[in-house]
Amino acid sequence: MKLTDNVLRSFRVAKVFRENSDKINCFDFSPTGETVISSSDDDSIVLYDCQEGKPKRTLYSKKYGVDLIRYTHAANTVVYSSNKIDDTIRYLSLHDNKYIRYFPGHSKRVVSLSMSPVDDTFISGSLDKTIRLWDLRSPNCQGLMHLQGKPVCSFDPEGLIFAAGINSEMVKLYDLRSFDKGPFATFKMQYDRTCEWTALKFSNDGKLILLSTNGGFLRLVDAFKGAVMHTFGGYNNSKAVTLEASFTPDSQFIMIGSEDGKIHVWNCESGMKVAVLDGKHTGPITCLQFNPKFMTFASACSNMAFWLPTIDD
């Protein structure tokens, strides 16, 4: 089944889970698409089975809190950032609920975390104005970059380069093997004082970069030329909430939730809005991602919703 405008318009909430007492701050699908794991401001980690459509288990990170949870390539392991006490990144085995390793180094809150799509490397960006490069096998930082502002960062789909959005005004591209030589490309954007960038994502085909903000718009950028292709708006975000925006796996569409529980979908190429879906969420939709392998997506406020299409094209 192929994603089309009509298929997207047909999506409806199939299941809602109320496992959390506070907002879900992040979730991540496993590479197989079979499970999704969430982190929440209530200090819990919840693992869901996407095929059976039910929560499998709940773990807690009471002391340090949990945010920016990400699957690694090994089965049943995740990395995540702390949101209280310290700014250490933690590597957890879900199998026995034990920490495998800690990654200390950042002196302020980690705001961006990206796992390499190909190996055990990951990068983290922090309010301490640094990006650090790590290897899951070592607690020591493998590389450090000092920047001129708050960073958001992500690997490209090949895992050969990473992009850093700095101070909400420029995107720099780095070659992973020689990042200490500085960026090989820098794209300056129009600075907007009304909001800041909250995330940077590549499309799966590597051609597009999506810049999310805590304002009322998103920017879609050509990953090779740095030109802004589209600015997407018309959704509600009056309280400057961090709303997650995502590409669909085919790189054809972009979606974002809003503070009023609706999901807005645009066509990347034309820039046209193709759907507004009502998730009936009780709060702002802070997290939204399409499943990498199956025709389903998930959205979250303090509740988690699984969506399915109601037509088969």
From Swiss-Prot:
Its main location: nucleus. GO terms for biological process: DNA-templated transcription termination; lncRNA catabolic process; negative regulation of DNA-templated transcription, elongation; negative regulation of lncRNA transcription; nuclear RNA surveillance; positive regulation of transcription elongation by RNA polymerase II; RNA polymerase II promoter clearance. The keyword Cytoplasm applies. Gene3D superfamilies: YVTN repeat-like/Quinoprotein amine dehydrogenase. GO terms for cellular component: chromosome; PTW/PP1 phosphatase complex; Set1C/COMPASS complex. It comes from the Eukaryota. The keyword Transport does not apply. WD repeats lie at residues 19-58, 105-144, 146-184, 192-231, 236-276, 280-313. GO terms for molecular function: chromatin binding. Regulatory component of the SET1/COMPASS complex implicated in the tethering of this complex to transcriptional start sites of active genes. Facilitates histone H3 'Lys-4' methylation (H3K4me) via recruitment of the SETD1A or SETD1B to the 'Ser-5' phosphorylated C-terminal domain (CTD) of RNA polymerase II large subunit (POLR2A). Component of the PNUTS-PP1 protein phosphatase complex, a protein phosphatase 1 (PP1) complex that promotes RNA polymerase II transcription pause-release, allowing transcription elongation. Belongs to the WD repeat SWD2 family. Component of the SET1/COMPASS complex. Component of the PNUTS-PP1 phosphatase complex. This is WD repeat-containing protein 82-B. It comes from Xenopus laevis. The lineage of its organism: Eukaryota, Metazoa, Chordata, Craniata, Vertebrata. The gene is wdr82-b.
